[in-house]
Amino acid sequence: MKNILRAMVILLIICGTYVLFIQYGSVPEKKSNDSEPQVSNEEAQSGKRIHMPTSGLLSFMGKHADEVTKKLGEPERIDPSAYDYDWWVYNQGKDQYIQIGVLNNKVVTLFASGNDINAKPFKIGESTGEVFKTTQVAPFVNVEYKGNSYRFEFSEEDINTRPTVKVGKMYVQLYMDKFEGKLSSIRAFDAQTFVKQRPYEVVYRGELIKPKAVSDEKWKKIQTTSEKQILDLTNVIRVKHGLAKLEWDQPTAEVAFGHSEDMKENNYFSHVSKKYGSLKDRLEEGHVDFQQAGENIAYNYVDGPAAVEGWLNSEGHRKALLNSDYTHLGVGVDRKYYTQNFIKRW
């Protein structure tokens, strides 16, 4: 009888514990699988805190757009994005290439490359060793926004080529040129914009904030302006390496767009199309006169500048970007599919 009573007591304790777990257990984490999973080390986040700069380009973050025009003047053009903000583009060649993201008259993101960028506390062109010496990079970064918690997890490749660190209240992505071992460019976000773009795999509690849906008509404008941004940044990189700028070639751009469109519609990623063949086949079909040609393709980057930085860190794509023989470029973007076609005229 005593054994039966003891068993009943144990059973009641187990049931009570289960009920308590269901009612008071922690909120479950959710995972958004936009990139490959990577295990994080919670203790690695501690380190030297970087404070918000009071001067330089990064000091624009969170400011009214009027502050930008006071310092930089009117933008060369204003490009739409897929993330609610508009890009204000300032292109001064190899010395300064800047895109300022403005939403509701407030700076929410920026991208910058060039030899004469004041990016305090960072310096574009600085060696990777110096960057990592002064900036502790963890395998993840945490974001808190409106009661939601996000942990963005970095792969080994992310850490080496495009890690993000917290600077004051903003997040700064550091694009590294792994072949030269230098800081190539920077991108800054406020918390909301960082979550909207999700440049890494994210584990989160709460709501996964997303940008507003983009109409087909707006996508066409985004794609066209992304093509211009890719041309701009490609030329910035070429001039930094002592090469001539590439001229835009519209027939080549139409061939490039056709390939991006074909990849999207037929759900593949390759330089060879089952329907339209190789690059040579496609250029000839498009009546493009060329002596030499090359092609870069990319998929699922957040935007044009991100795709260019990805090409820069891939040996084969980098060779095309920095090939001194090429004279003209055509770019075609269809949603998250990017194609660069390089040619040398006869």
UniProtKB/Swiss-Prot annotation:
Major localisation: membrane
Pfam families in the record: CAP (PF00188), CAP_assoc_N (PF14504)
Stretches with biased composition (Polar residues): 35-44
GO cellular component: plasma membrane
Membrane topology recorded in Swiss-Prot or TrEMBL: Single-pass membrane protein
Keywords annotated in UniProt: Cell membrane, Membrane, Transmembrane, Transmembrane helix
Coiled-coil annotated spans: none
Annotated protein name in UniProt: Uncharacterized membrane protein YlbC
Organism: Bacillus subtilis (strain 168)
Gene name, Swiss-Prot/TrEMBL: ylbC
